[in-house]
Amino acid sequence: MTLNTEQEAKTPLHRRASTPLPLSPRGHQPGRLSTVPSTQSQHPRLGQSASLNPPTQKPSPAPDDWSSESSDSEGSWEALYRVVLLGDPGVGKTSLASLFAGKQERDLHEQLGEDVYERTLTVDGEDTTLVVVDTWEAEKLDKSWSQESCLQGGSAYVIVYSIADRGSFESASELRIQLRRTHQADHVPIILVGNKADLARCREVSVEEGRACAVVFDCKFIETSATLQHNVAELFEGVVRQLRLRRRDSAAKEPPAPRRPASLAQRARRFLARLTARSARRRALKARSKSCHNLAVL
């Protein structure tokens, strides 16, 4: 029996259908399968489509973030400020807010909420919109985080006490300390208001005490009477002027240059200057006590 080895060597081998084809390390060829992925992807991966993941956009500022310190000074909210009324119950905060709202002039004010009022005032020929918030008592009774946000979300603060209630005056001093802790680096105007000046016979807090408190805590001072509508307009016009002055003052300030270490001679001069500065401090304190009731100056 003769084996045709030469004929078998020339003819290609026939494989069964179940026999796998050899893997090719090269690219795709007709009739063969390739397990090597293509270097150029024809379609983006799932979850990476540009239509499914649009570029992120910054959220629009909330109304609570409206402030005179906004970087967009040319925006439509430049002259809108949030004024927060603080103080014990019964000192006249709601009466002052109602007079600000001008209930006799419905076309000049808009009530945004139960205790929130908005009104545009023309002071020194320039329009400024104030949003007066009288929600301190509701937030205090609620004992929630909103009371803390009330101390942080104002463009200006009006601390009200009654001249016929020394306890409310002491509470006003405590509120001023809380505001100082909350706004340590902020240039926020704070006005101390002695309301119910019409109750002169029941007075427990003198004008001198109110001024001294304003000087110590670096704020403005004014006495009002919501019953007689005395100094109420001057109060809110003063708030507008203080906001403008603080805004201009903070804009004019430049970051300080880095200080060099002082020499021995410079330190000696500073020490001698401190020894002789007591009279100057007294004069400055006296000047501040004279100007603390002037809401048209810093």
UniProtKB/Swiss-Prot annotation:
PROSITE patterns: RAS. Residues 35-55 have a biased composition (Polar residues). Most highly expressed in the endothelial lining of the blood vessels in uterus and heart. Lower levels found in spleen, lymph node, kidney and testis. Also found in cells with secretory function such as the islets of Langerhans, lobule/duct epithelium in the breast, bile duct epithelium in the liver, surface epithelium in the endometrial glands of the uterus, colon mucosa and acinar cells in the pancreas and the prostate. Residues 268-287 are annotated as: Calmodulin-binding. It comes from the Eukaryota. Keywords: Calmodulin-binding, GTP-binding, Nucleotide-binding, Phosphoprotein. Residues 63-73 have a biased composition (Low complexity). InterPro entries: P-loop_NTPase, RGK, RGK_GTP-binding_reg, Small_GTP-bd, Small_GTPase. Gene3D superfamilies: P-loop containing nucleotide triphosphate hydrolases. One of its GO terms (molecular function) is transmembrane transporter binding. GO terms for biological process: negative regulation of calcium ion transmembrane transport via high voltage-gated calcium channel; regulation of skeletal muscle contraction by calcium ion signaling. The modification Phosphoserine is found at residue 51. In vitro, interacts with calmodulin in a calcium-dependent manner. Belongs to the small GTPase superfamily. RGK family. Promotes endothelial cell sprouting and actin cytoskeletal reorganization. May be involved in angiogenesis. May function in Ca(2+) signaling. This is GTP-binding protein REM 1. It comes from Homo sapiens. The lineage of its organism: Eukaryota, Metazoa, Chordata, Craniata, Vertebrata. The gene is REM1.
